[in-house]
């Protein structure tokens, strides 16, 4: 519903990072919803390092959606580094996350802080459940998500955010409480994944057709298809290579044994995670 004082918002940019496809599914759904309301959406996928290194002009867009997975309680480091190079010039924006049903609060707080530093104006955020990346290695978190209820929430998010863009309504936005973890503590938490994923994506070379896709798609240029493994310094354990291998010959060590521990650490159960709902913050 438009008000007389509303500003035109007809061209929207959608910047997203998606290694295993969950965030892209939400981005696609937002695009579909907005285009149904005659808003043109241009998608810009920053998953590959080549795209992240291009200079992007934001001038021609009325507003921007950013979509990121949550990695170790925040937007992935490579996305934050990309954002640090952008100039917001008071452009209106919104951020949505996908996450695997564990920690997520600091992601909203820290993305707001970073976007404000870069002079973007945040009008809303949202979080959507997405099958946990580490399910490829034996976990069972948020399997089958995003699902129909997440997509319905996505539609609401798209509509409500568009209304806020048009009204330039930034009054109540995302008043996230100061989080209990400092950036330095979160940097340390980021390293924790390598305590679990001890063997980086590695090829079981029996059936490999050497298509090189793992190397081409790697977001950080870490994968070496000929060697059949990833560089330990550069790999961010995003599993893009594993998720997209047409021969299904890439794997890490099996972390199924760490699943119960993970649930206990978070004082939760598989059922509780499966029942979690996606949320919008206006
Ligand atoms: C390195 C890494 C760290 C992650 N950290 C978290 C986390 O802190 N909390 C959480 O709930 N999910 C976490 N996840 C799961 C992802 O946020 C989730 O699976 C997301 O939907 C993946 O998005 P994509 O399919 O677009 O890549 C992590 C995944 C990876 C690869």
Model-derived features: positions:
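Iron-sulfur cluster-binding cysteine motifs and their immediate structural context
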Residues: 203, 209-230, 240-258
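Short, solvent-exposed loop/turn positions at domain surfaces
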Residues: 52, 229-232
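DNA-binding recognition helix and immediately preceding turn/loop
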Residues: 196-206
């Amino acid at each position: 519903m438009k008000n007389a004082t509303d500003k035109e918002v007809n061209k929207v940019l959608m910047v997203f990072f998606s290694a295993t496809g969950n965030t892209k599914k939400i981005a696609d759904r937002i695009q579909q919803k907005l285009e149904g309301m005659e808003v043109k959406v241009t998608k810009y996928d920053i998953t590959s390092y080549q795209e992240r290194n291009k200079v992007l002009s934001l001038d021609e867009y009325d507003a921007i959606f950013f979509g990121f997975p949550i990695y170790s309680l925040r937007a992935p480091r490579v996305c934050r580094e990309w954002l640090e190079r952008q100039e917001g010039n008071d452009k209106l924006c919104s951020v949505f996350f996908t996450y695997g049903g564990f920690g997520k609060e600091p992601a909203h707080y820290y993305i707001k802080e970073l976007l404000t530093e870069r002079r973007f104006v945040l009008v809303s955020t949202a979080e959507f459940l997405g099958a946990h990346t580490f399910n490829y290695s034996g976990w069972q978190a948020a399997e089958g998500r995003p699902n129909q209820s997440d997509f319905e929430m996505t539609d609401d998010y798209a509509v409500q955010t568009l209304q806020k863009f048009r009204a330039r309504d930034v009054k109540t936005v995302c008043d996230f409480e100061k989080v209990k973890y400092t950036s330095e503590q979160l940097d340390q938490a980021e390293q924790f994944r390598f305590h679990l994923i001890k063997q980086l994506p590695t090829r079981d070379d029996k059936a490999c057709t050497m298509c090189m896709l793992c190397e081409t798609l790697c977001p950080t240029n870490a994968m070496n298809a000929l060697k059949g493994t990833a560089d330990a310094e550069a790999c961010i354990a995003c599993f893009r290579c594993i998720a997209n291998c047409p021969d299904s010959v890439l794997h890490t060590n099996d972390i199924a044994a760490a699943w119960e521990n993970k649930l206990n650490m978070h004082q939760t159960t598989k059922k509780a995670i499966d029942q979690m709902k996606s949320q919008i913050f206006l």
